[in-house]
Amino acid sequence: MGRSAPMLESEVEALRVVAKEKLPRMLAAAAERTGLHYRRVTVRKTHSRWGSCTREGNISLSLYLATLPDELIDYVCVHELCHTVHPNHSADFHAFVNHHLGGKEKTLAAKLRTYHPGRKRKEG
């Protein structure tokens, strides 16, 4: 598989419009399904991570998350929501995430590692 190319700024701006509508909606659906709560959500142009959660329950999602398959967007949303209960990456945290993902955390995490924020994925 070849290296992925960075997105053009025009592509990023078009993606921002989609992401600001889609990602908060998917986070809200994941929160409803899991019974977990967050304070607010922001969508940012971050290259180093797909999402983050503060101790206050504020969740930030990378706009590049909107380029992923819905099952991976849901995985990141559930992962960040679980940080509202476990603000770390302990064994308890991962067990909690895995519970809310029907035992698929490791599979989804492995799939997510094949993508990189802000890069176009080369098929192949």
Provide a role label for each language-model segment.
Residues 80:
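Walker B catalytic acidic pair
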Residues 1-75, 84-124:
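Active-site-proximal or metal-binding-adjacent scaffold patches in catalytic folds
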